[in-house]
Amino acid sequence: MEIFGNVVSGLGEGRFFVGLTPYKNKFKELTGFTPFEGTLNVKLKHNFNLDEFNPIEFDGFEIDGKKYFGGKVLLVKLFDKSGHSINCAIVAPKKTDHSKKTLELIAPVHLRKFLSLNNSDVVKIVI
């Protein structure tokens, strides 16, 4: 399945959460790569239901009495408008401020730099 969306600025929280060691280790275990500390946000025209694609669920954890929620991850391939691509993953935290129209992607590299992406650029996600 192919999904198209536009690159948008995030809330600035992806870098913090992906950088937490328990999340980083879990993402490496589930995806096969150590994620860059940050996410790429892609805004879709319609709501996206990740559960239709059998994502892998992961549990939350606690650090110094602070609870961090689990979520779901799905391996995908991301393409820029020139056809360049990279394997990455959609991450859907159980607790998020994003709408169901916004996808958060992680990869072993800084996706904006690797694919020379700017806000409003159209990208294709292949599941």
UniProtKB/Swiss-Prot annotation:
One of its GO terms (biological process) is FMN biosynthetic process. It catalyses: riboflavin + CTP = CDP + FMN + H(+). FMN binds at residues 96, 104. Binds 1 Mg(2+) ion per subunit. This is Riboflavin kinase. Mg(2+) binds at residues 39, 41. Pathway: Cofactor biosynthesis; FMN biosynthesis; FMN from riboflavin (CTP route): step 1/1. One of its GO terms (molecular function) is riboflavin kinase activity. Catalyzes the CTP-dependent phosphorylation of riboflavin (vitamin B2) to form flavin mononucleotide (FMN). It is an enzyme of class 2 (transferase).
